[in-house]
């Protein structure tokens, strides 16, 4: 029951906040270009790239965590060069930093919205061997 209530409240809360998000995206520019990733919608090229290897999903919430995640991924790649890393972030600033420093073999995405249909779609698409949460934020 609580899970259903959470999902209903999250959905309507998101709809209520959507105008604010859209205004922010318009002001910042470029932020909207990957907005569909929040819904688990990825370009065909990106989906093809995901088929290139065994995937480890690394989630870094913001800038500080991105630096930790990039170091972790680099060190792990030295041991397991066959792995493909999928790095997700929550903020546009963290995304921009990761974009500049991420290994070309890896994939950078925005973290999906916390709704069951979206999370299932992302898990089906990414099909990760493991998920590494650099820092977990539970609200």
Report each predicted region and the residues it spans:
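Short hydrophobic helices that act as membrane-entry/anchoring signals
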Residues: 2-25
